[in-house]
Amino acid sequence: IPVMVPGAPSAWAELSEKFGRLTLEKVMEPAVTYAREGYPVSPVISKIWNNAYKEFIDTLKDESFKPWFDTFARDGHAPQPGEIWKSEAHAKTLEKIAKTHAKAFYQGELGDQIDAYSRKTGGYLRKSDLENYWCEWVKPIHVNYRGYDICEIPPNGDGIIALMALNILKGYSFTDRSCVDTVHKQLEAMKLAPAVIDGSVRMSFSAENE
């Protein structure tokens, strides 16, 4: 399955650089500690985790998924409520991201490992994809819906779909949020908006970035 370049590490680095008073290493210390020393899994998370495990054990048979089970279901099951879950590999990864301001993830050792595993398992993600990526600072787009300014991230994000759907719905009056007519109009707006986006906005965005 093709995957996109993960953007979170670069976002952590950018947010820390622009707004933080502490180093990224200091900010990520608690996450590293939880990963290394472990934390008790809550009942809600345990249930969600177990549901995912039950689904994955029946569907993810390929050898490429074995590391997932080795990491998140070491004893052949999802962690039980109150069980201490830890991952030294996660701790080391977070430390490398923090120490290099995320450069290790996109341009260094972690990027090499991602590339190697992707090639080994028939994936498409390459280190060149990682090297060519860094998060962007963008101006939000917005609409005014019944007196409220609703802001979203512009394309290539999907927030514009929600804004367009709200613009469609501005032309209608609603009295009961649970009535069939209200739900029907909301569903139709959410069906129409993506069709318009796919047919015009995405094509325009792609052309501008070729």
Locate predicted features.
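Feature marks proteins synthesized as precursors that undergo proteolytic processing into two chains
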Residues: 1-210
